[in-house]
């Protein structure tokens, strides 16, 4: 007989570590599991120390959040520990963030934080504490498959779904993780917080990059990678100089505003040339692509990745967290993979994630994903497309 976490044994005999950020979601996660009788231990990670951020609405992981997490733990009567991960976070997340921008990419630091810190280091700590699982307040769900493994699926609350940021979760990590809020909406979570009489019930959600207290990410990049803030030229597709810029880190693919140049028609950033420090701009149609190359592909679908894509795998992909999944197919082998977009996309930026799903909406299963290495120009992206025969089977939850 399995308990509510799909584990054998009584809740009171099952230790669960909850990653407590000090926000309402992780606090309700801890409260729910405690109310169900589990042996809950709360852990909060101190990831950085920015004085301005400690009391700033919209930031997360700062001093006030640690205080809030501790108060919730006391309210629930559970042990609570604060672990200093500042050095690890700086090396794995902040330094990589700055390096990515300096190389002309637009990174997603939350993905690396989940992969390296929360689901890497913290998961290891949870095991050392004798926990059977690590639970988080992410809006995503997992389902037990017939063979006992788990599938990662989208959350019930589509507006809050965080599956895009968790594509790099490995199968081994997924087996150990639980997401109790996956079947709830945000209003339901806040209502539970009030029922549990948690002080954070109406606390603002985190919105900013947690280690950028002012919201100006270029401050961090300029300090760690000053070369990314060196001035250069803004040119059109033919190399004609249109203006000047104060650092490629100020720009991202698809950007239109803030170019500071006069033109007869709207111009968009279509390329960042790190070698020449040039920002290349062009018309909107120059942003369109049908083919994306990927790196660091993670596969959590059924079977082995190369076997799944041998004849091309039809699926759905999301190339930004704010965009809906679009039909595509995946092909490649031996670590080299490409995604071909059926309808094409605009403004695909290197450094962002391309996440694989088995359906375009609903409780779709996450099949994995990779980081975007490059977007092939439209003129060469549509040649020789061969429709795949293998189709991903959706998981019904």
UniProtKB/Swiss-Prot annotation:
It comes from Bradyrhizobium sp. (strain ORS 278). The active site is at 113 (nucleophile), 210 (cysteine persulfide intermediate). Belongs to the MnmA/TRMU family. It catalyses: S-sulfanyl-L-cysteinyl-[protein] + uridine(34) in tRNA + AH2 + ATP = 2-thiouridine(34) in tRNA + L-cysteinyl-[protein] + A + AMP + diphosphate + H(+). Catalyzes the 2-thiolation of uridine at the wobble position (U34) of tRNA, leading to the formation of s(2)U34. The lineage of its organism: Bacteria, Pseudomonadati, Pseudomonadota, Alphaproteobacteria, Hyphomicrobiales. Keywords: ATP-binding, Cytoplasm, Disulfide bond, Nucleotide-binding, RNA-binding, Transferase, tRNA processing, tRNA-binding. Its main location: cytoplasm. The gene is mnmA. The keyword Cell membrane does not apply. ATP binds at residues 19-26, 45, 137. The record marks 138, 352 as: Interaction with tRNA. This is tRNA-specific 2-thiouridylase MnmA.
């Amino acid at each position: 007989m399995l308990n509510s976490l799909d584990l054998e044994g009584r809740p009171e005999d099952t230790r669960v570590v909850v990653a407590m950020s000090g926000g309402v979601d992780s606090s309700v996660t801890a409260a729910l599991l405690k109310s169900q009788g589990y042996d809950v231990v709360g852990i909060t990670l101190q990831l950085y120390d920015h004085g301005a951020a400690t009391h700033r609405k919209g930031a997360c992981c700062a001093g006030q959040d640690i205080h809030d997490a501790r108060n919730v733990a006391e309210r629930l009567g559970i042990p609570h520990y604060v672990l200093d991960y500042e050095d690890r976070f700086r090396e794995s997340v902040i330094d990589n963030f700055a390096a990515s921008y300096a190389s002309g990419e637009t990174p997603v630091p939350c993905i690396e934080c989940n992969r390296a810190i929360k689901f890497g280091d913290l998961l290891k700590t949870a095991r050392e504490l004798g926990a059977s699982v690590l639970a988080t307040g992410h809006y995503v769900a997992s389902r037990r498959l017939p063979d006992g493994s788990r599938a990662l699926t989208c959350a019930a609350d589509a507006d809050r779904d965080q599956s895009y940021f968790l594509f790099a979760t490995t199968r081994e990590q997924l087996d150990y993780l639980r997401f109790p809020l996956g079947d709830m909406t945000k209003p339901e979570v806040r209502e539970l917080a009030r029922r549990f009489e948690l002080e954070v019930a109406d606390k603002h959600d985190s919105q900013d990059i947690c280690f950028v207290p002012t919201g100006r990410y270029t401050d961090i990049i300029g300090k760690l990678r000053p070369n990314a803030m060196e001035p250069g030229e803004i040119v059109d597709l033919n190399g004609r100089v249109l203006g000047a810029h104060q650092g490629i880190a100020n720009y991202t693919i698809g950007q239109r505003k803030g170019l500071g140049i006069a033109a007869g028609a709207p111009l968009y950033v279509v390329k960042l040339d790190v070698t020449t420090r040039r920002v290349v701009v062009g018309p909107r149609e120059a942003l369109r692509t049908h083919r994306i190359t990927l790196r660091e592909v993670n596969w959590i679908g059924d079977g082995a990745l190369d076997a799944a894509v041998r004849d091309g795998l039809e699926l759905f992909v999301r190339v930004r967290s704010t965009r809906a999944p679009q039909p595509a197919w995946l092909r490649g082998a031996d670590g080299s993979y490409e995604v071909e977009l059926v309808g094409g996309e605009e403004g695909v930026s290197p450094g962002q994630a391309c996440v694989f799903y088995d359906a375009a909406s609903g409780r779709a299963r996450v099949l994995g994903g990779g980081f975007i290495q490059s977007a092939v120009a439209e003129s060469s992206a549509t040649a020789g497309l061969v429709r795949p025969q293998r189709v991903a089977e959706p998981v019904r939850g």
